[in-house]
C-alpha cells in the first residue's frame, strides 16, 4: 500500500492530460511522411526523364540533396544512358571511301571476251633441253670448221712467208718484218731499223743478204759513208 501511495503521489492528473508530447510525436511522424512522399515524387519525375533519354547533365541537375541509395541509382542510370549514347554513335553509318567505290565500279564494268585466233604461221618452240646426240653433233661441226679455218690461215701465212722478201736487200728470213717505203712488212728487221732512223742508203746491205758485195756494199754506216764519198770522187768506179 505504501508503494501504491508513493506511485500515486508521483503521478498527477495534469501529466495524464498533458498531450503536448503526443502532438510533437504526431508532427514528427507527419513530417517524415511528407519527406518520404517528396522523395518518391522526385524519384518518379527522374525516372520519367530517364525514359525520355535526356542527357546525363539534366539527370544529375535536380534541386535538393538525395540519400546515398538514390545517388547510387542515379549513377547507374547515368552509366546506362552514356552506354546507350556510345552504342548509337558507334552503330552510325560512316562515310564511304570514294576510291573504294570507284574500284568496285571498275570491277563491275562488263568486258567483252577476247576472240580466239588461230595462229597458222607461228612456230612452236619446245621448252625442252636439246638431246645429247644433237649437242655432240653441233660441237663436232664447230670443231671441224675451226680446224679448216686454222689450216687455211696457216697455209696462207706459209705462202706469204715463202714469197716475202726484203725489198731492199732481198732477205727472206728475219725475226720481224718492218715498215718500209713500199708499205707495211716490206723490209727486214735490219733494214727497217735503219729506214726508221733515216740511215737506209743503197750501199747498205746486211751480211746475210744474197745481194751483198764487198766492193760496193757494207753493213757499217761509217763504211757506207766512205763508199759514197769514193763514188763522188771517182764516178767511173761505180
Swiss-Prot record:
InterPro entries: GATA_TF, TF_GATA_pln, Znf_GATA, Znf_NHR/GATA. Residues 32-45 have a biased composition (Basic and acidic residues). Keywords: Activator, DNA-binding, Metal-binding, Nucleus, Transcription, Transcription regulation, Zinc, Zinc-finger. It is found in: Nucleus. The keyword DNA repair does not apply. The keyword Zinc-finger applies. It comes from the Eukaryota. Residues 24-64 are annotated as: Disordered. It holds the Pfam family GATA. Transcriptional activator that specifically binds 5'-GATA-3' or 5'-GAT-3' motifs within gene promoters. May be involved in the regulation of some light-responsive genes. Belongs to the type IV zinc-finger family. Class A subfamily. This is GATA transcription factor 7. It comes from Arabidopsis thaliana (Mouse-ear cress). The gene is GATA7.
Amino acid at each position: 500500500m505504501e508503494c501504491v501511495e508513493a506511485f500515486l503521489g508521483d503521478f498527477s492528473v495534469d501529466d495524464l492530460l498533458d498531450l503536448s508530447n503526443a502532438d510533437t510525436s504526431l508532427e514528427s511522424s507527419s513530417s517524415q511522411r511528407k519527406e518520404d512522399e517528396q522523395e518518391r515524387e522526385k524519384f518518379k519525375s527522374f525516372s520519367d526523364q530517364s525514359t525520355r533519354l535526356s542527357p546525363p547533365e539534366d539527370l544529375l541537375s535536380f534541386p535538393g540533396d538525395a540519400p546515398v541509395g538514390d545517388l547510387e541509382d542515379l549513377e547507374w542510370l547515368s552509366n546506362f544512358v552514356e552506354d546507350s549514347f556510345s552504342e548509337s554513335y558507334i552503330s552510325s553509318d560512316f562515310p564511304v571511301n570514294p576510291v573504294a567505290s570507284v574500284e568496285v565500279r571498275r570491277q563491275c564494268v562488263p568486258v567483252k571476251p577476247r576472240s580466239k585466233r588461230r595462229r597458222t604461221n607461228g612456230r612452236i618452240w619446245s621448252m625442252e633441253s636439246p638431246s645429247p646426240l644433237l649437242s655432240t653433233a653441233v660441237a663436232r661441226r664447230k670443231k671441224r670448221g675451226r680446224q679448216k679455218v686454222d689450216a687455211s690461215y696457216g697455209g696462207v701465212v706459209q705462202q706469204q712467208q715463202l714469197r716475202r722478201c726484203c725489198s731492199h736487200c732481198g732477205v727472206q728470213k728475219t725475226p720481224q718484218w718492218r715498215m718500209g717505203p713500199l708499205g707495211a712488212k716490206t723490209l727486214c728487221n735490219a733494214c727497217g731499223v735503219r729506214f726508221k732512223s733515216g740511215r737506209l742508203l743503197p750501199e747498205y746491205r746486211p751480211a746475210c743478204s744474197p745481194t751483198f758485195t764487198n766492193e760496193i756494199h757494207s753493213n757499217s754506216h761509217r763504211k757506207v759513208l766512205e763508199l759514197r764519198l769514193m763514188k763522188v770522187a771517182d764516178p767511173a768506179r761505180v
